[in-house]
Amino acid sequence: MLLHLVLATWKPDVRAEDVAELAASVRRFADDIPEVLLVRAGADLEIQEHNADFGMAAVFADPSALGAFAAHPAHLAVSRRLATMVASVTRLQFSLADDDPIIGRPDPVKA
């Protein structure tokens, strides 16, 4: 299993409505893209300073599932939209143990 993270910092002209629309599109990945096992996205809560403005986390079975996700039309459309909004973006992938507590939990958004 692997966790894919995306952290974005917005350009000054990005509107809250644009962010809400983008977040909704990202959350639909779990329904639209079979390789996405779990996905979360949202704006920074501004609890600490020097954070990104927006983050996305998605779980995949393996690197090939991440590759299929990266090539999926729904992901490509969101990536194109994101590219118009960001001043900077950082991506990171790391391994999750198969017995990690995050795996196998019901998705509260779908429940």
Residue spans of the language-model regions?
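Short S/T/G/P-rich N-terminal loop/turn motif that feeds into the first structured element of a domain
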Residues: M1-D53, A61-A71, F94-A111
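Interfacial aromatic-anchored transmembrane helix boundaries in multi-pass membrane proteins
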Residues: S88-V89
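Residues that form generic nucleotide/phosphate-binding pockets
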Residues: S25, R81, M85
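Short, flexible helix/strand-to-coil boundary loops that buttress conserved ligand/catalytic motifs
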Residues: A70, S79-L82
